[in-house]
Curated annotation (Swiss-Prot):
Family membership: Belongs to the RNA polymerase beta' chain family. RpoC1 subfamily.
Complex formation: In plastids the minimal PEP RNA polymerase catalytic core is composed of four subunits: alpha, beta, beta', and beta''. When a (nuclear-encoded) sigma factor is associated with the core the holoenzyme is formed, which can initiate transcription.
Binding site for Mg(2+): 489, 491, 493
Species per Swiss-Prot/TrEMBL record: Drimys granadensis
Subcellular location: Plastid, Chloroplast
Membrane-crossing segments per the record: none
Protein name: DNA-directed RNA polymerase subunit beta'
SUPFAM superfamilies linked: beta and beta-prime subunits of DNA dependent RNA-polymerase
Amino acid sequence: MIDRYKHQQLRIGSVSPQQISAWANKILPNGEMVGEVTKPYTFHYKTNKPEKDGLFCERISGPIKSGICACGNYRVIGDEKEDPKFCEQCGVEFVDSRIRRYQMGYIKLACPVTHVWYFKRLPSYIANLLDKPLKELESLVYCDFSFARPIVKKPTFLRLRGSFEYEIQSRKYSIPLFFTTQGFDTFRNREISTGASAIREQLADPDLRIITDHSLVEWKELGEEGSAGNEWEDRKIGRRKDFLVRRMELAKHFIRTNVEPERMVLCLLPVLPPELRPIIQIDGGKPMSSDINELYRRVIYRNNTLTDPLTTSRSTPGESVMCQEKLVQEAVDTLLDNGIRGQPMRNGHNKVYKSFSDVIEGKEGRFRETLLGKRVDYSGRSVIVVGPSLSLHRCGLPREIAIELFQTFVIRGLIRQHIASNIGIAKNKIREKEPIVWEILQEVMQGHPILLNRAPTLHRLGIQAFQPILAEGRAICLHPLVRKGFNADFDGDQMAVHVPLSLEAQAEARLLMFSHMNLLSPAIGDPISIPTQDMLIGLYVLTIGNRRGICANRYNPWNRRNYQNKTVYEYNNNYRYTKEKEPYFCSSYDALGAYRQKRINLDSPLWLRWRLDQRVIAPREVPIEVQYESLGTYHEIYGHYLLVRSVKKESLCIYIRTTVGHISFYREIEEAIQGFCRAYS
């Protein structure tokens, strides 16, 4: 359906019999109303045309060929001057044949039937609402159990039958004949109730607000009683309280949605449009029918068998009527959910029939196969690999996938820049992979986000937006921090790529779905982008440094002997480096350059010149050593920093004791903070 905001959506729920008949009924020009399927037939074996009032009737579902009725007459579709719109002979409407994809019919059931989804699925909504055991309700639905109605000031059928059976044993065999007359239904319907009609009566009687109030009162009373001291009794009370909560929620749902509970019992059974349950011919002209058709035929056969004794004047034993009602209930159960009551129904080849539940549920069902997970244009799929050099909001897209997804945009760019005169020439340039194609592709990708999805999509973070960049190879490169949101691993997992086309979709992707804007879990609010174990190990190795303290060379005899054979190196006139002595650097660039030239190790301690910052200097710390120079300046050496002072004891500069790993880590954090400030300034 389409709401007032023009959003297409699908709503599933229970409907009234009036709504079902309104979907199917049509009034012919002669005043006849069609829409009810009364015959279990499909196509005539001689003419190969749909049977009238059958499962494929053209009067009910529309013509097989657009504008052509069952008689072969033709009318122009949509021409208001053409009159009439229905064929006077066969009653088929002159419309497009696509109407057979959505025009429904219905079967008028001779007796009410409980909907097995509401009755047998756990938790059973009918059992919860009526507060009765499921086994007792099953006996009632399948006519194994009956209950008496309260009748006042009337001779009861039950009392009369009991007196005949127990007081006058000689007339025991003649009494069933009396009760099999046509008046049996009148007596029985007044005195006793069984089958789905009994369930329907019980669902229609109670007030939902009273059910909610009584359940709340009982729940409070059980809560006030406290523990009984017996573990079994405590569990029993806990289960009862949980049941009362479910019952109140169910009643409130019916009140909120304005749905009558008796709709869980069917009086009219909808019939799917013919195109959704087709009959096709395979090789050799052999017809192959959908399993739904066979299950519909079974329902119609049993329903007609029950309708005949109820509408004709011939006598039928009451037990036979109840047995036939049970067969109708079982046939509808098989149609809706085959096998829910035990052994599923099979065909002649010992193959289980596919019911409604089998058609719509599961990975190959109607929803996941054709509505939610169907193949769409502007999408691709590939394996994901880690891209540690990527930003959090970027992903690497293989060239092969990128050129296919953005091909229409690239073609438009080639034509706009007069590189190609038409679409054919543009496609040839793309096929030949000319350099200008990749340049235009990069321009297109800069302003167009993409969506990455990993199945199953269990929560909002299963689909996130990224800014694509071209990557070599055939795998999608992904930042490791976004892995947790997708619940993915880099061990062969695959992801789907989608391109949002409309401006609304692109704006939603940029404002709501970008990965760097989804850092917290929507469920509990905890950070979702946290370092993994391998990242923590890498950071540990990067920042562990050399465990030797500043006094290691001074007080270690072995190091003191090696210190006598030191060698001094000059590098860019900015620092002095010795094999044993810790080197001095004026900037982090010099330190990283020495590391790249393999003059120092990643964990080698060094002295790095730093800006004067009082937060680095400890006010009461005593220097380990003071070194004086010839010009009067001196160095105060502390545990983690070195302070250079002038003759007047003024601080000239400061060196901090660090490693190349610490420098690299600090620079990455500093660049990230600066980029964040620029983005939000």
